[in-house]
Amino acid sequence: MTTGTPDCLILIAEDNAADLALVREALKEHQVECSLHVSNDGAKAIAFLHALDVDPKAPQLDLVLLDMHLPKRDGEDVLKTLRSTDRYGQTPVIVMTASDSPEAQQTAEKNAALYYFRKPSSLSEFMQLGALVRSVLSPSIGQAESGTGAKKNAGGRK
């Protein structure tokens, strides 16, 4: 399901409805006005990435918000698929997970995730994610609003 404006595109791969609602609220609060494509399992996220990759008219994918514990295909599979595509291999990824295991963080780092975000349990904590998304996308949003500018490399914490 894709919603929003066509100026930028975010893939949200999240199977938890409550967490998805918090992510949406955080994006809204931080005025992130992008098209959102939501996949509630890893297989659907991978199918979406493949569909984008083979369609030369598909929009640019600006960001992926990725839960690592997805049904059918896990977040690591989604991340590896994304990194293997020519067109979207450099797309910024923010990994969202409830896991605090060193292995989960190493997997994210190994696959060049820009940020590793430990999922909190409250809206106020999710607001940090909204601010992070806004900072990653600010060059894209600025380009869409002004018609100029270049994307910068966003520094990350991992």
Show the residue positions of the predicted features.
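Acidic, metal-coordinating helix/loop segments flanking the phosphotransfer/catalytic sites
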Residues: 24, 38-63
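Residue-level signal for the "D+5" position in two-component response regulator receiver
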Residues: 38, 70-73, 110
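Short, glycine/charged-rich "phosphate-handling" switch motifs in NTP-dependent
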Residues: 114
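Active-site residues of response regulator receiver
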Residues: 62, 66-67, 97
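The feature encodes the CheY-like receiver
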Residues: 66, 71, 101
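C-terminal output helix
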Residues: 121-133
